[in-house]
């Protein structure tokens, strides 16, 4: 049949939904070959004139992942109606063809068909998935012009869109103007805060939600647990877990994985394991989360045990799984296991190692003092694989094992690759200082000043009475600053009495030695632990989250603090966990 004849015959001719042809489409589902065969049958039988059948065919072709086939079918539809457009826009947006959803929406407008709330929710979702802020604002104006500005579903979609696009102020304004906010709207706003790194705002809104009597669902909890992970709010994480249990909320794999991640990242890996063991049937993501949880705490043997069990259950590890495995091997010094895992990626699973895997391997060799092997590994990488992150891992190994000559060479290479990254200058300055080349330290510092580069600010958060408190180095913003500083001074004196000796090299090298010790004393994690000791009862474990790697001096000081206060102190820095107890650290000084 010619295309023109086909166009002429695809009209609004109705067909009963329970026809044999419709049932055939339902049975075929999103199977492209089957759909093409059914389309041929429709053409021969004349049933292609049914708008219901054509709409169903379009929806299923989207679900099958063939947007080109969808476009070809749509091209032959004469005078598509609103129902067809809405179904097509929703399916395109739902199955990842967001740009096509916007193009179909434009076609709908040029066809002089009025969009509905059903249209707008799908179009706004497409804008959110594309982070298309400008287009989304235009669609928002269409919403208002068409009188759907107060529709709760459209408003919830707008909240999600603005939040995903980073326009949190606008998202909150839309949210606050909603006459009725259902759980979907609350979830959208809470998720927006969490995904934009504002975990404290997410938690505050969650508490407001509870206060107003809105019952959270599993989606709410997944987001809140992620915020707890971000902030290290273990007590709130306990509360959420208890709420889930007490209210009989079904713990699916997604929620269980969120719990595993939260407990692991907040320092209670045994509780994470309990959640993992309670799963009837986990997926690769849940298994990977448990491997990662053990790895970040330095429990490499346990991480590998989970990895081997996963393979025994015939669950194929993916690239993310191998990042977790290799990281666990690096932090625990499991060199042979790491080598075997890396080799198996290509040989057994057909996976191509990426940047993260290469960084883990260099880090693993470097931590173990195998600098020549790490350097040889780098030399064997292709030009496109020699990214700054790989060299940064090598530089960290040079600093750890005091190979100043190679460290300076690599730091200078990093600066040539990323001249606007202040971290590289700081590392180069440290290498020069450790090598005793103070004139070079001053030179690097001057270059940073000339280029307007500033060292990344370090901060630490501590959860006290279910509230997060943030500190930065030398922070004096807290209302109890004087008491905190007095307590910390006394604490450091007690540590010195027990044998603690400050390590001035950990401070800024442009300072005099006495000034360096003063700067070290008021690092953010020391202020956080002083506040925590002041505000909690004797024997309570303190948990601190730091955005940067803990320095050598603070690592040493916390061992002594754990002795003189008889407390366990858990610190999560940007690399791993450190459990300080009775004068030792779980990392065994291997970080």
Each language-model region and where it sits:
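Terminal (and in a subset, N-terminal) low-complexity or junction segments at the ends
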Residues: 1-182, 191, 200-591
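Short glycine- and Lys/Arg-enriched binding-loop motifs that mark or flank ligand-binding interfaces
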Residues: 188
């Amino acid at each position: 049949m010619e295309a023109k004849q086909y166009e002429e015959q695809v009209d609004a001719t109705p067909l009963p939904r329970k026809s044999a042809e419709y049932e055939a489409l339902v049975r075929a589902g999103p199977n492209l070959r089957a759909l093409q065969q059914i389309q041929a049958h429709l053409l021969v039988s004349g049933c292609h004139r049914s708008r219901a059948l054509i709409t169903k065919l379009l929806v299923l072709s989207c679900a099958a992942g063939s947007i080109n086939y969808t476009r070809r079918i749509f091209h032959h539809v004469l005078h598509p109606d609103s129902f067809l457009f809405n179904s097509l826009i929703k399916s395109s947006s739902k199955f990842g063809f967001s740009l096509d959803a916007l193009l179909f929406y434009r076609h709908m407008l040029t066809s002089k068909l009025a969009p509905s709330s059903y249209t707008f929710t799908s179009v706004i979702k497409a804008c959110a998935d594309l982070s298309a802020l400008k287009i989304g604002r235009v669609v928002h104006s269409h919403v208002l012009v068409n009188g759907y500005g107060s529709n709760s579903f459209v408003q919830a979609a707008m909240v999600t869109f603005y939040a995903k696009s980073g326009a949190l102020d606008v998202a909150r304004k839309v949210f606050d103007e909603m006459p009725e906010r259902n759980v979907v709207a609350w979830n959208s706003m809470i998720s927006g805060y969490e995904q934009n790194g504002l975990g404290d705002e997410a938690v505050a809104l969650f508490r407001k939600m509870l206060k107003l009597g809105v019952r959270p669902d599993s989606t709410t909890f997944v987001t809140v647990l992620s915020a707890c992970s971000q902030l290290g709010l273990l007590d709130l994480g306990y509360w959420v877990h208890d709420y889930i249990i007490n209210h009989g909320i079904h713990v699916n794999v997604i929620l269980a994985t969120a719990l595993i991640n939260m407990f692991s990242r907040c320092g209670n890996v045994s509780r994470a394991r309990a959640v993992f063991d309670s799963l009837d049937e986990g997926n690769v993501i849940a298994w990977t989360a448990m491997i990662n949880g053990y790895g970040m705490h330095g429990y490499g043997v346990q991480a590998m045990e989970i990895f081997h069990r996963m393979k025994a259950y015939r669950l194929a590890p993916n690239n993310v799984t191998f990042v977790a495995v290799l990281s666990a091997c690096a932090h625990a010094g499991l060199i042979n296991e790491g080598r075997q895992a890396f080799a198996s990626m290509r040989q057994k699973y057909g996976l191509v190692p990426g940047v993260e895997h290469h960084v883990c391997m260099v880090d693993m060799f470097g931590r173990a003092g195998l600098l020549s092997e790490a350097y040889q590994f780098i030399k064997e990488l292709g030009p496109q694989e020699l990214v700054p992150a790989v060299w940064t891992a090598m530089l960290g190994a040079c600093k750890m094992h005091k190979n100043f000559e190679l460290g300076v060479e690599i730091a200078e290479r990093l600066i040539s690759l990323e001249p606007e990254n202040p971290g590289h200058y700081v590392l180069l300055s440290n290498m020069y200082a450790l090598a005793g080349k103070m004139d070079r330290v001053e030179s690097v510092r001057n270059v940073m000043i000339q280029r307007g580069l500033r060292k990344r600010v370090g901060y630490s958060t501590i959860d006290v009475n279910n509230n997060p408190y943030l500190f930065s180095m030398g922070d004096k913003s807290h209302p109890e600053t004087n008491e905190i500083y007095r307590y910390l001074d006394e604490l450091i004196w007690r540590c010195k009495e027990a044998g603690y000796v400050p390590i001035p090299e950990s401070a800024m090298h442009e300072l005099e030695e006495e000034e360096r010790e003063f700067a070290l004393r008021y690092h953010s994690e020391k202020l956080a632990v002083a506040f925590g000791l002041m505000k909690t009862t004797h024997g309570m474990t303190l948990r601190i989250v730091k955005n940067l790697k803990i320095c050598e001096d603070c690592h040493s000081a916390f061992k002594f603090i754990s002795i003189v206060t008889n407390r366990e102190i858990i610190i999560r820095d940007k690399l791993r966990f450190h459990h300080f107890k009775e004068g030792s650290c779980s990392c065994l000084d291997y970080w």
